[in-house]
Structures are given as C-alpha cells and as structure tokens.
Amino acid sequence: IKNDTIPSPTTLNLSLKQLPSSQIAKRSVALSTLKTFLYSRGHNYSFEMSSPITAETSCSRISPYLAFGQISVREAYQISEKYARGLGNNNKKYSKSLRSFSSRLRWHCHFIQKLEDQPSIETHTLHSSFENLRPSLCDPKVLEAWETGMTGYPMIDACMRYLNATGWLNFRMRAMLVSFASYHLWLDWRLTAKHLAQQFLDYEPGIHYSQIQMQS
C-alpha cells in the first residue's frame, strides 16, 4: 500500500487540544490515575485492554509511574486489593477485571526478576540456537519505515505513529509491532528493541527485553 502524506490537524478538522499528549510525571497524578482506574475506567478492563481503541482509557495507565518509582507495585497492589475486597460479590465482571490487573502486577515483578537472574537477555537470545537467525545489519530504509510508521500497513503504521506521539501503547499492539518487525521485515530484535525502548514512557528493561524476545 502506497503511503500518503501525514495530514495536518487542520486537514482533519482537529484542534491541537484533541491531540494525544504524554502523561504528567507527578506522584499525585500517579495516585489519581490509579484511583480513576479502580473507581470507573477499569470496569471493563479484562475485556477492553486488548483493543487499541478502548485500551487508552480502560487500561490502568500507571506503568510510567511504576517505571520511575512514583508509585510502587506493592502500593498499587494493596490499593487494588483493598478496593476489590470492598466490592465483595456484587460485581463479578468488575472483580474479574481487578483480578486481571493484579495478576499483571505480579507479572511485572516476575519479568524484572528474570533480568536480574539472566542479564544477558538484553544482548543475547534466550535460546542460543536462535542466535544469528536474522542478520545483525539491515536495510536502514526498512528500519526507518517501521520506526516512523511508514511501512504501508495501516494498522502497523497507526500504532507506531500513536506510540511515537504519546509514548504509550497497549500490550497487544506492542506485541504486534515487534512480531511484524521480526517476521514480516525480518529485523533483528536488538535493532527494534532500541527504538521501542526510546519511545516507551514506561520503559522497564526487565519487562522490555523479555517481551521483545518472546514476540520475536
């Protein structure tokens, strides 16, 4: 699919106020973000976290604050569990969403520990038989097209442009970007990992490199 020029906000009848923006780095904002997730935004979390359309508001959005220590995993977990206990059996659908959220907090710790135990995953493949599977060098134009969201694949490009503009993207779409780069473009995961690490507001090495290798 041939790429067109990126339209301006005026062309799309959008005001600058409607453009996505980065999250504000404050502890008070971290706590309020978690609370709005627990009290309202997260009601359909387990059903809406996979879509790039609904995930923007239905996901917790506290990952940047966890990465920079403005709120801890323990604190987020305790607040979430306290709120879940208050629900009781009154809302099974919402309780399921909170359980899904709590499990992801545990995964957060699991992957960080994995890097502590095996720091080589940042630079070497988890399974040595896959080393040198893809060339370490690539056509720079191909890599640039992927990095800038100009591959010609609408879904891929939309997600990459959104990430580049906001610094955030939901997990399923992150996985899609990596798998597309690895299998369709046959790019080495170390090349793509660097760009994504620079874009993610919530970059956390332990999670990042484990997921990059799993998806590639």
Describe the residue ranges of each PLM region.
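Secondary-structure capping and boundary motifs in well-ordered enzyme cores
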Residues: 54, 58, 64-68, 72, ...
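Contiguous, well-ordered alpha-helical segments that form the cores/surfaces of helical PPI scaffolds
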Residues: 63, 141-144, 154-164, 174-184, ...
